[in-house]
Amino acid sequence: MFKALKINPGKARFDILFILFFLADLSCSSRLRINETPQVSQTRDLSIRMAAEWEPALGTLLVWPLSVPYKLVIELARDNHVYTLVENETAKNEAHKWYTAWGIHPEKISFIYTPQGLDSWWVRDWGPGAVYTPDGTMKLADGKYIFSTPITGIGCLDSLEFIYKSKENTIIKTETDDNATVPLGKGLELPVLDLPFINTGGNVATDGLGTAFSTCILLNENQYYGISENQFFELNKELTGIRNYNIISNFEKRGIQHIDCYLKLLDEERILVMEPPHDHELYTIYESILQKELMGLKTPYGRPYEILRIKTGRYHQDQLAAYTNSLILNKTIYVPLFKIKEDEQALKRWQEVMPGYIVKGFEFDLADEPVVSKQMKEHYRIYGWQDGDALHCRTRAIWDPEMLFISTKRIESPVNTKHKNIVYCTIIDYNKKGLVFEKCIINWRVASGKEWNTIRLKPEATSNLFSAEIPFHQSGTSVEYYISAVSKSGKSETQPRTAPQGTYSYSVH
């Protein structure tokens, strides 16, 4: 089943940072940290950074044989481009046959030959992120993926248990998947940046401004691999530009503890967190992490995060529907559905928190799929989504190496009538052709007005930084605004990306 909904407009290594870890409460296994973030008055010039999920992308990475619903493939190809990993010519021909039968145009698909190991389905976990280097080059950031995805208890110091073991009880390594990024880079004609540490994608959420979130199992995985906590943070700072690394407690009593099944970064200052039923055994754990950890964190702009909630429900016994395990790709959000009453509510919630985006939901009943591999049937049996393994786990963006990047420090509402309503933003043209400065503007209007006013952004002293003041101070009104920019390459971009359907806003008191 596939559901699409159009969202209505609505409101939508350390130098300055050190993180202290210690074991606090074994009942919920909190590993607390002090996160010191300076008060930032404007956005920063970013010389090296790891991309966020919501940034401009060329398309989506999948693997054949498929591990996602065929209707999802159709929609991904319709919306952008599908990059399909195949092991050989036989697999490519089979995939091409089915894609053609589903009406997917050949120009919307690319095939790339890569080796496939035990974990090939989970391109999110072993697959590469995108790092933009000081010279503006995008590289595929290839973390280590040697021991697959271990599980652990809820305590941050609990031991790791490895899923794949031989009859002799030795760990079966997943080096085949670990080695797949190099041929992927060759197929995409993109350079590969080797990250000498574990960087399991489903447990790494980044904001594009040097902040990342993971659960504490990631530190344990790296320690098992021989990378200390200090080395992990130092290497991230040096190679990915992540200076502010927020490690939160594990949230499952036993599991892989991947953060994308607990929360979702919506942008630089908003976090969507799952909310279980109040009578669920994990409810108090989820709430404790939110109250004691997330609410104490600061955004890159030195402000508390806006914490939003998405209600979930049981789909099988006590297993929770993983609605945060969704994919944000350009202007569309792809959501896993679990055939429960909470599905419709989850889609509506995604609409509310992401104005202007198209939200599409996908069920994954294997009986409804035209082609299902033997391995998929053995692994999932009846239904293809699980509480710790859904849509986000099996997809990954291929970001645009020549993107027009915009990030902004939005005006914090409400403001008084004497407040200088200055908007600061970072604009980087990775195409390197240069910006059309007269078309880098702020668009603003009184809320629900018909006409947009425009103000040209002024360059700051630091490269890539811009600002402008919205000259409106009438008490009792609300103002909507968005940023737009144009590159000499012909690319244009807005922030929010769905503007003018989605905008920023503030009220004047």
Named regions from a protein language model:
Residues 397-509:
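Glycan-association/targeting regions that enable binding to alpha-glucans and other polysaccharides
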Residues 15-25:
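Bacterial N-terminal signal peptides
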Residues 13, 31-33:
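Basic polycationic patches enriched in arginine
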Residues 1-10:
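N-terminal secretory signal peptides that target proteins for export/translocation
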Residues 34-405:
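The feature marks the mature, well-folded catalytic cores of soluble enzymes
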Residues 5, 14-17, 406:
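A detector of low-complexity, intrinsically disordered, Ser/Thr/Gly/Pro/Ala-rich segments
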